[in-house]
């Protein structure tokens, strides 16, 4: 039975997240419905990152085992046809070894959080960025962000319902870059805790607004207490960009 690796792009706004849940439609559910329409029976589609409600993906990775062998291009096109009108696109499909696991074979995940730092209302980016009208000091944000890079106990920056066994994670990158009114917060790690990226972004915004210093951010990390965290950024601006294997 061949195993297929899929690269998937999606707008997370209409979904309760990647994973199938009882409280609404999911990206995983839409994909599994499309696969069933092609092969005639249920097939589990496993993703590399279980993105939260409203979070987008530019290149989510998934794998599935399908009894019938399809040419990769034909499978891609068939899935895209059955996914309409969902805002989900299968960018590519390929046959991979049986031991490939989209989630557990991953060695690094890359995310970007996008902020529109302007006073004007959003017109073309509604639901795709976090609009903040107050000018952010992105140099201060970037400098403070480096205090979070490395291996730490990220209890402060994880959701209270996070099911990870350990709060320890190694953050490989956390950069804050400005391009005009557009601010990108770029981060990468082998894996992240539930709501970790959005929690770090919200706290960095407090630094950018002058409410916190870099030392305040470091103190919040050291507190290892969820209540020490700044605000949690909305999901609108968060994108899963790439997964490395």
From Swiss-Prot:
It catalyses: uridine(38/39/40) in tRNA = pseudouridine(38/39/40) in tRNA. Substrate binds at residue 111. One of its GO terms (biological process) is tRNA pseudouridine synthesis. Its EC number is 5.4.99.12. InterPro entries: PsdUridine_synth_cat_dom_sf, PsdUridine_synth_TruA, PsdUridine_synth_TruA_a/b_dom, PsdUridine_synth_TruA_C, TruA/RsuA/RluB/E/F_N. It is an enzyme of class 5 (isomerase). CDD domains: PseudoU_synth_EcTruA. GO terms for molecular function: RNA binding; tRNA pseudouridine(38-40) synthase activity. The keyword tRNA processing applies. Gene3D superfamilies: Pseudouridine synthase I, catalytic domain, C-terminal subdomain, Pseudouridine synthase I, catalytic domain, N-terminal subdomain. Keywords: Isomerase, tRNA processing. The active site is at 52 (nucleophile). Formation of pseudouridine at positions 38, 39 and 40 in the anticodon stem and loop of transfer RNAs. Homodimer. Belongs to the tRNA pseudouridine synthase TruA family. NCBIfam families: hisT_truA. This is tRNA pseudouridine synthase A.
């Amino acid at each position: 039975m061949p195993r297929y690796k899929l690269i998937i792009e999606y707008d997370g706004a209409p979904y309760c997240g990647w994973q199938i849940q009882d409280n609404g439609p999911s990206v995983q559910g839409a994909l599994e419905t499309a696969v069933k329409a092609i092969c005639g029976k249920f097939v589990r589609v496993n993703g590399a990152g279980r993105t939260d409600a409203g979070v987008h993906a530019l290149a989510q990775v998934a794998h599935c085992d399908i009894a019938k062998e399809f040419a990769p291009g034909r499978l891609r096109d068939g899935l895209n046809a059955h996914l309409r009108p969902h805002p989900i696109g299968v960018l590519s499909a390929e046959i991979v070894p049986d031991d490939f696991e989209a989630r557990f074979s991953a060695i690094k995940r890359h995310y970007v959080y996008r902020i529109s730092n302007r006073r004007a209302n959003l017109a073309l980016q509604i639901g795709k960025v976090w609009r903040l009208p107050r000018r952010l000091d992105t140099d201060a944000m970037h400098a403070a962000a480096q205090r979070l890079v490395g291996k730490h106990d990220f209890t402060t920056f994880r959701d209270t319902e996070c099911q990870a066994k350990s709060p320890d994670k190694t953050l490989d990158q956390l950069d804050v870059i400005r391009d005009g009114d557009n601010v990108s917060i770029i981060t990468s790690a082998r894996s992240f805790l539930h709501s970790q990226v959005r929690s770090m972004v919200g706290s960095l915004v407090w630094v950018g607004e002058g409410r916190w210093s870099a030392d305040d951010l470091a103190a919040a990390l050291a507190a290892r207490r969820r209540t020490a965290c700044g605000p949690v950024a909305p999901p609108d601006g968060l994108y899963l960009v790439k997964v490395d294997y």
